[in-house]
């Protein structure tokens, strides 16, 4: 008999089927046993009257929460069952795996007249046993929503003639800042783990691919202990040619994110609201845009927030947070494009205008930066000069060669998939990654 997923069980009323999954809840009394069985698609109550099925009693007495079982039985309607008014009356229960007592508490347990409350284990304790923690409804919903988000963005790009590529993660030179890379031994020389696919995205433009994107792992050797940074993360990057300005890049990104959020809201919006208390809002386009200097002026006027002149070329962490309050008040929006950063704070490959202003932006969602995007400098001599200004020309010599033999104007951006997930569900980065990596975390 083939396995039936639990979400398909309502179609099988009156039929005998086979289901498989983890035991989420177990109540075993003298006369009755109730098992809540969970698979990746849903939950089903298994009801056993022991007098009617004495052959199952020994098996039921061996069961523990989180054990894995296969159950064969008849699907019947029962209006008293909370899970859709459906239950299964088993004829056979097969134990696939018995679970020991769990080493973590995944959810806080409220106090009763007979028992004290039990606190939820800390996030670090839960990461120690992440495979157990991931069985919760919240975690499985989070990754379903993430999968939906990424798939919708991928479809959006494929429908617009983008090509998906996969670039090297072992590289000869740092693509961003040399102080933030992991150095690894590569036979008789040093190599680095890629911080981004930036150089190779642009190589694809020089190759005439015109429109590309990539999803993959990237690495940052930052000793940061915030709730939004990790040393390994999943990126969603794209680059495309024949743009007229960085505004074309901004337009592409806002349409991409809107498509992703629309898909998530349709598929999982109600569940995200129920389990995480977060409203999935499909944003209106175009997104609000503000120059960095004007944002600082607005934050000072409305929140009394000021920074030294030396800091005004970049966005501070506090300004990033306050920008959400500012954009909600002025535009009733969750997203904000910020432009006109200092050239000192931007990568050497960002194009600059006649006044030396980088032609790029940051995108903030719910008070957290999710993107840096820009029009790239594709003119060899100009790009070489900008690399020399930052003392990088020799280190990125191979990259500069991409632009010696013809290259169209182009631009792009990168998104952190984990950070998108974190903000979507209102979590920390430790909760939002399948397995978090940080300065003090390299296992499991």
Per-segment meaning from a language model:
Residues 271-285:
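Short, highly charged C-terminal tails/helix-capping segments
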Residues 108-110, 269-271, 419:
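Juxtamembrane/interface motifs at transmembrane-helix termini
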Residues 259-273:
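Flexible helix-coil linker/hinge segments at domain or subdomain boundaries
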Residues 164-166, 272-276, 338:
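Cytochrome P450 heme-thiolate monooxygenase catalytic core
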Residues 2-243, 435:
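Class II aminoacyl-tRNA synthetase-like tRNA-binding/catalytic domains
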Residues 180-262, 285-444:
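A translation/RNA-centric and nucleic-acid-associated enzymatic feature enriched
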């Amino acid at each position: 008999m083939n396995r039936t997923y639990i979400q398909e069980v309502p179609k099988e009323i009156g039929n005998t089927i086979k289901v498989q999954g983890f035991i989420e809840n177990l109540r075993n009394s003298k006369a009755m046993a109730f098992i809540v069985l969970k698979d990746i698609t849903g939950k089903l109550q298994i009801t056993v009257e022991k007098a009617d099925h004495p052959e199952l009693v020994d098996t039921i007495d061996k069961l523990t929460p989180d054990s894995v079982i296969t159950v064969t039985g008849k699907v019947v309607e029962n209006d008293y069952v909370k899970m859709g008014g459906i239950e299964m009356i088993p004829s056979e229960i097969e134990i696939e795996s018995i679970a020991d007592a769990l080493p973590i508490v995944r959810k806080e347990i409220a106090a009763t007249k007979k028992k004290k409350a039990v606190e939820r284990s800390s996030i670090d304790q839960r990461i120690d046993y992440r495979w157990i923690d991931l069985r919760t409804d919240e975690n499985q919903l989070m990754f379903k929503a993430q999968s939906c988000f990424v798939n919708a963005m991928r479809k959006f790009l494929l429908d617009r003639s983008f090509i998906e590529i996969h670039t090297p993660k072992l590289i000869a030179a740092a693509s961003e800042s040399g102080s933030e890379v992991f150095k690894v031994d590569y036979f008789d020389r040093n190599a680095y783990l890629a911080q981004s696919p930036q150089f190779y995205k642009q190589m694809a433009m020089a190759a005439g691919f015109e429109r590309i994107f990539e999803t993959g792992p990237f690495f940052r050797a930052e000793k940061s202990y915030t709730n939004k940074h990790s040393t390994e993360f999943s990126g969603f990057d794209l680059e495309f040619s024949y743009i007229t300005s960085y505004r074309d890049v901004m337009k592409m990104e806002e349409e991409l994110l809107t498509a992703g959020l629309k898909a998530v809201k349709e598929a999982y919006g109600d569940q995200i609201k129920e389990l995480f208390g977060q409203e999935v809002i499909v944003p209106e386009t175009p997104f609000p845009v503000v120059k960095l200097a004007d944002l600082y002026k607005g934050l000072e006027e409305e929140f009394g927030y000021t920074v030294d002149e030396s800091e005004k070329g970049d966005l501070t962490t506090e300004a990033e947070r306050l920008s959400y309050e500012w954009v909600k008040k002025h535009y009733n929006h969750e997203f904000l494009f910020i432009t006109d950063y200092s050239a000192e704070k931007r990568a050497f490959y960002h194009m600059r205008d006649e006044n030396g202003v980088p032609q790029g932006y940051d995108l903030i969602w719910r008070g957290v930066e999710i993107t840096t995007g820009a029009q790239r400098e594709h003119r060899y001599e100009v790009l070489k000069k900008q690399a020399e200004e930052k003392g990088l020309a020799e280190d990125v010599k191979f990259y500069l060669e991409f632009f010696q033999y013809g290259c169209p104007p182009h631009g792009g951006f990168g998104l952190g998939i984990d950070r998108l997930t974190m903000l979507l569900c209102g979590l920390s980065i430790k909760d939002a990654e399948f397995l978090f990596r940080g300065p003090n975390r390299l296992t499991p």
